[in-house]
């Protein structure tokens, strides 16, 4: 069992790599954003929040209250399919959320940070298409589906998210710098203490190059861990 966190700003490519790596190793791919949106859109969920306002927060790039997101993520990790390992994409975003993972006695084996320029992020996000149910991500230029607008696996329609525009992208990047960037120092210290392994990936590279680099990292260290 290997539990992995993909850390990086929106558009850094971590969602695409999460799908590829989870498929490669047969572990679960947990997209925090898609889990949250799905939960808020299903009427059987009853939150003490205004769901319309919460969806607006998500789409505008603002952080969602910990009281909402943390229980959803922990509940997802507790499901049986995650016992063989998982990738967390989009969570944690703050040190408080990282501590919540520890407090729930969930061990993390690897943290991968995707380092990428703002200009590359904007180019990647504009034109992105998402399969809502699975979180699989495509791009009309860089990673197109086999059929335009159709998910490769299910044949269901892909959508362009409301928050995938330049104005919201900049807002989300500002939020990332304000909160999430401190996770880099936090997890580097955890790595230095031997609690997990932390790596920085050049996210400006092509998808296939990043994928090969990740495979090399995991294969080498998983072999050592075994």
UniProtKB/Swiss-Prot annotation:
Keyword set includes Nucleotide-binding: yes
Gene Ontology annotations for the cellular component aspect, listed alphabetically: cytoplasm
PROSITE patterns in the cross-refs: ADENYLATE_KINASE
Biological process terms in GO annotation: AMP salvage
Region (NMP): 31-64
Source taxon at top rank: Bacteria
This protein's UniProt keywords: ATP-binding, Cytoplasm, Kinase, Nucleotide biosynthesis, Nucleotide-binding, Transferase
Molecular function terms from GO: adenylate kinase activity; ATP binding
Catalytic activity: AMP + ATP = 2 ADP
Enzyme category, top tier: transferase
Pathway where this protein functions: Purine metabolism; AMP biosynthesis via salvage pathway; AMP from ADP: step 1/1
Cell compartments where the protein resides: Cytoplasm
Chain spans, region LID: 127-164
Main location: cytoplasm
E.C. number(s) listed in UniProt: 2.7.4.3
This protein's domain notes: Consists of three domains, a large central CORE domain and two small peripheral domains, NMPbind and LID, which undergo movements during catalysis. The LID domain closes over the site of phosphoryl transfer upon ATP binding. Assembling and dissambling the active center during each catalytic cycle provides an effective means to prevent ATP hydrolysis.
HAMAP family xrefs: Adenylate_kinase_Adk
Subunit: Monomer.
Family: Belongs to the adenylate kinase family.
The name this protein goes by in its record: Adenylate kinase
Source organism of this protein record: Blochmanniella floridana
Gene that encodes it: adk
């Amino acid at each position: 069992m290997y539990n992995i966190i993909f850390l990086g700003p929106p558009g850094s490519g971590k969602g695409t790599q999460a799908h590829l790596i989870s498929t490669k190793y047969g572990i679960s791919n947990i997209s925090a954003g898609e889990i949250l949106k799905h939960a808020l859109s299903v009427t059987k969920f009853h939150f003490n929040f205004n769901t319309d306002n919460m969806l607006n927060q998500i789409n505008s790039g603002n952080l969602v209250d910990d009281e909402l997101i943390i229980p959803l993520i922990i509940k997802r990790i507790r499901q049986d399919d995650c016992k063989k390992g998982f990738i967390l994409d989009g969570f944690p975003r703050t040190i408080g959320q990282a501590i919540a993972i520890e407090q729930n006695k969930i061990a993390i084996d690897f943290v991968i940070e995707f380092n990428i320029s703002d200009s590359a992020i904007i180019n990647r996000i504009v034109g992105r298409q998402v399969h809502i149910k699975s979180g699989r991500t495509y791009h009309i230029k860089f990673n197109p589906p086999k059929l335009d607008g159709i998910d490769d696996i299910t044949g269901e329609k892909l959508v362009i998210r409301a928050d995938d525009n330049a104005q919201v992208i900049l807002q989300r990047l500002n939020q990332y710098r304000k909160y999430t960037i401190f996770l880099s120092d936090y997890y580097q210290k955890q790595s230095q203490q031997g609690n997990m392994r932390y790596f920085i990936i050049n996210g400006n590279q092509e998808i296939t190059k990043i994928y090969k680099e990740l495979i090399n990292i995991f294969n080498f260290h998983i072999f050592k861990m075994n």
